[in-house]
């Protein structure tokens, strides 16, 4: 929808939204807010950059806070994958400091370049938004493509100088926790993060069919996945219990504990096909056998 010729009276956000609502009654409330936001700023670089950065911070730390609360509650230890390694407040604070430093020094400059990248690759910011069904299948595709990128890039980071000088930073915590999802070397943040950002951008470049709001929903879900896979808990209601191909915290926690194998981000099949999960399955079998043996002795 082209609204560049519309005359808006007043500069307040609410006044702009109300006028646009009268001009475009066919738009839903969220679409009206979206349009009013861009009209209010009247600067797409600032509007998109600010929204992108705030979205990232709110989603990332907002998702981490529940896991911090869970870590502080002994009741949940029964589902902690490494129950003897609960992060201390000092560890979480130290992790938060480095994560915030990387957000403001590494990610913020990239985020402020996001609107020019959107324009270059052809992302739409107009209203109305695309149908929900289109968003769902595009985001599903991005999950599969990002998982492929992540597997191979992550596996590369476990070789020689790539691990010693870059990826070793992320492996500081052998028992990961939610906040540690983005505790990483700047080069790792850029290269692994490329799967999240540039996969959709390249899709848009070749298809000319992607909306910024779809991109935001995708990034939100990807942040949820990253934080949850580092949280260190495997609940009976975890997604991998209902979707067996989903990796989840159980899959990634072993990677941090053993410093090898299980290189995928969201799914399990790359590790299964290339047999980089064999040690993981052997470890789980030994742990299960030890559990049964302990229960048998207790029953006697």
Swiss-Prot record:
Its cofactor is Fe cation. Its EC number is 1.14.18.-. It is an enzyme of class 1 (oxidoreductase). One of its GO terms (cellular component) is endoplasmic reticulum. A motif (Histidine box-2) lies at residues 167-171. One of its GO terms (biological process) is ergosterol biosynthetic process. This is C-4 methylsterol oxidase erg25. It comes from Schizosaccharomyces pombe (strain 972 / ATCC 24843).
């Amino acid at each position: 929808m082209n609204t560049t010729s519309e005359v808006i009276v007043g500069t307040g956000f609410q006044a702009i939204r109300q006028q646009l609502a009268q001009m475009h009654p066919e738009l839903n409330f969220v679409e009206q807010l979206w349009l009013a936001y861009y009209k209010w700023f009247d600067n797409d670089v600032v509007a998109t950059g600010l929204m992108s950065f705030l979205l990232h911070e709110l989603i990332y730390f907002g998702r981490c806070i529940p896991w911090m609360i869970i870590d502080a509650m002994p009741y949940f230890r029964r589902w902690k994958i490494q129950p003897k390694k609960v992060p201390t407040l000092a560890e979480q604070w130290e992790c938060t400091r480095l994560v915030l430093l990387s957000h403001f020094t590494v990610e913020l400059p990239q985020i402020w370049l996001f609107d020019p990248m959107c324009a270059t690759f052809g992302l739409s910011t107009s209203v109305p938004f695309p149908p929900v069904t289109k968003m769902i299948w595009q985001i599903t595709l991005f999950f599969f493509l990002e998982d492929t990128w992540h597997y191979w890039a992550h596996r590369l980071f476990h070789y020689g100088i790539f691990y010693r000088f870059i990826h070793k930073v992320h492996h500081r915590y052998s028992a990961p926790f939610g906040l540690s999802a983005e505790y990483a070397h700047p080069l790792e943040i850029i290269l692994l993060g490329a799967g999240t950002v540039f996969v959709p951008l390249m899709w848009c470049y070749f298809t000319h069919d992607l909306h910024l709001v779809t991109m935001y929903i995708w990034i939100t879900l990807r942040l949820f996945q990253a934080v949850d896979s580092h949280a260190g808990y495997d609940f009976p209601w975890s997604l991998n219990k209902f979707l067996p191909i989903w990796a989840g915290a159980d899959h990634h926690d072993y990677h941090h504990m053993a410093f090898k194998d299980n290189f995928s981000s969201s799914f399990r099949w790359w590790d299964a096909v290339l047999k980089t999960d064999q040690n993981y399955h052997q470890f789980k079998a030994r742990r299960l056998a030890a559990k049964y043996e302990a229960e048998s002795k207790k029953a006697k």
